[in-house]
């Protein structure tokens, strides 16, 4: 969304409101904030700890009680010519690295374990030894970037990719796990994995017979292959995953669904070409359907994907609308998790930055009632996004649509109340929305009515207070609104305040208009 002009729905803003560059910056900043929150929702690295009761895909193979060896004894055994001692040393190393707390990864690396493990990976005559070595390296690669780099620099990646074709499913699965940890370390490590043809290796592994635990690991690896920017992954490779990821959205497994959605959220967090590739994979109706799930671990990445898609072209946004996205977004605006409400409001704000037909679809879906509730009592981060949705509508909507915001959906009061926030960016968004409303009222001959409404709702007092704001843009915008619409000049004000003769008696404020029955409207 920060890559090119076409990446922002906000680019459709009119020149008299928020400028295009500012809105692109806003989309970029919001996406950065959302991307940071992913760390709470998805693990990029996973350690295979030594616990029989866990639902991890790989279990102890021999059921033997562990033999306690020192690190020096482990290394000596691994370097032995005796195959049984090699296996005992390798297994002991793996178990030490599989401790739930404080595994001695650096200690093992310092004792030269990694190159020995790499050598064992290539021992095709002993799949048990290969498996133990792969497991140990998986856990080393689950550590810090330096620890992962050690595994990469000893040329483990091509050996793991080769093991994807192993006849031992346990060994192939452990190789997938190791590659997932390596790819999850960052863009550079990810690209090393991709350039060793990992996609050629994993696609044949997915079929109707693939065990669920194995499938989960494969999809998690796929999500890490799609993740990270600066640079983004090579799209000529990643796009090969899209038909499979789209098909995986039909899975019944929560973990498979979640990781498939995360993968698509990473792909769509880019330019319109990549968004279109996801649209072409028929993923959108499936993503939209997943928005009605009860499981937040699925809703969050599915919503992120849909939110990214509506930052694309009008046609791409139309696919979301045609797939029934708006009613589901309306429900998510009422969700009990504030981060889901925030992202639903962010998604709606991008749709209202589109064309008038799309804004009408938002109106007809009843979403502005939900936005009003968010503005009134939602979490502040969600309120910010709701404010953008309103301001975008005042920018791009028809006069009838904008009037509906005020008269039908009663948005004005909670919208104005956000002028009290401490966040200058949000204040400016509300000020821009108000400026747009006044510009329309002027065209419709309703400026006086709108002024009275804003004043009755406390808006004038808030704007006057903002004239003392430390942010220059904020106080200049506040001054401009007051000066243009609320200031009639001193002479006129004095004339209004002077007593006038009415029916032979002096009255003050004799010329002040009386409020019409039913209140003020445009």
UniProtKB/Swiss-Prot annotation:
Residues 1-56 form the IBB domain. GO terms for biological process: female germline ring canal formation; gravitaxis; lymph gland development; NLS-bearing protein import into nucleus; sperm individualization. ARM repeats lie at residues 64-105, 106-148, 149-190, 191-233, 234-275, 276-317, 318-359, 360-400, 401-447, 448-489. InterPro entries: ARM-like, ARM-type_fold, Arm_3, Armadillo, Importin-a_IBB, Importin-a_IBB_sf, Importin_alpha. It is found in: Cytoplasm; Nucleus. GO terms for molecular function: nuclear import signal receptor activity; nuclear localization sequence binding. Residues 1-22 have a biased composition (Polar residues). Binds specifically and directly to substrates containing either a simple or bipartite NLS motif. Promotes docking of import substrates to the nuclear envelope. Seems to act as a cytosolic receptor for both simple and bipartite NLS motifs. PANTHER family: IMPORTIN ALPHA. Forms a complex with importin beta subunit. Belongs to the importin alpha family. This is Importin subunit alpha.
């Amino acid at each position: 969304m920060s890559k090119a002009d076409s990446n922002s729905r906000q680019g459709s803003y009119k020149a008299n409101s928020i400028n295009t560059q500012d809105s692109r910056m806003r989309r970029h900043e919001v996406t950065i904030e959302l991307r940071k929150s992913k760390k709470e929702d998805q693990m990029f690295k996973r350690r295979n700890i030594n616990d029989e009761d866990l639902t991890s895909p790989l279990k102890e193979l021999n059921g033997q009680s562990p033999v306690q060896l020192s690190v020096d004894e482990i290394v000596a055994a691994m370097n032995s010519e005796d195959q049984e001692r090699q296996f005992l040393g390798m297994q002991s190393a793996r178990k030490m690295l599989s401790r739930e707390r404080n595994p001695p990864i650096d200690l093992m690396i310092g004792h030269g374990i990694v190159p020995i493990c790499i050598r064992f990976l290539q021992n095709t005559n002993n799949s048990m030894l290969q498996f133990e070595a792969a497991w140990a390296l998986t856990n080393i690669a689950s550590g810090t970037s330096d620890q992962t780099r050690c595994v990469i620099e000893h040329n483990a990646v091509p050996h793991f990719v080769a093991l994807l074709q192993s006849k031992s499913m346990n060994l192939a699965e452990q190789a997938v796990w190791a590659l997932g940890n390596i790819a999850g370390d960052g863009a550079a490590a990810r690209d090393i994995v991709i350039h060793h043809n990992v996609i050629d290796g994993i696609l044949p592994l997915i079929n109707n017979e693939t065990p669920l635990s194995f499938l989960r690991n494969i999809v998690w690896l796929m999500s890490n292959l799609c993740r990270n920017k600066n640079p983004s992954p090579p799209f000529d490779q990643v796009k090969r995953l899209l038909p499979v990821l789209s098909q995986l959205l039909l899975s019944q497994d929560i973990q498979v669904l979640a990781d498939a959605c995360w993968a698509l959220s990473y792909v769509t967090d880019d330019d319109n070409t990549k968004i279109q590739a996801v649209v072409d994979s028929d993923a959108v109706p499936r993503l939209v359907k997943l928005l009605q799930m009860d499981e937040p671990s699925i809703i969050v990445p599915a919503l992120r994907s849909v939110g990214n898609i509506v930052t694309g072209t009008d046609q791409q946004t139309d696919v979301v609308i045609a797939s029934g996205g708006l009613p589901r977004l309306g429900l998510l605006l009422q969700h009990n998790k504030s981060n889901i409400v925030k992202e639903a409001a962010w998604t709606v704000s991008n749709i209202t930055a589109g064309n008038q037909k799309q804004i009408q679809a938002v109106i007809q879906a009843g979403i502005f009632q939900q936005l009003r509730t968010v503005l009134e009592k939602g979490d502040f981060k969600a309120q910010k996004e709701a404010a953008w949705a309103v301001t975008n509508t005042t920018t791009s909507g028809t006069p009838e649509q904008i009037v509906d915001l005020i008269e039908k959906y009663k948005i004005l009061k909670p919208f104005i109340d956000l002028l009290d926030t401490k966040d200058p960016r949000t204040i400016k968004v509300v000020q821009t929305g108000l400026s747009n409303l006044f510009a329309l009222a002027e065209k419709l001959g309703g400026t006086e009515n709108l002024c009275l409404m804003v004043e009755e709702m406390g808006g004038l007092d808030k704007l006057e207070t903002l004239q003392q704001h430390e942010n220059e843009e904020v106080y200049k915008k506040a001054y401009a609104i007051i000066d243009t619409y609320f200031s009639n000049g001193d002479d006129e004000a004095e004339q209004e305040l002077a007593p006038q003769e009415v029916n032979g008696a002096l009255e003050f404020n004799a010329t002040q208009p009386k409020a019409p029955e039913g209140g003020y409207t445009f």
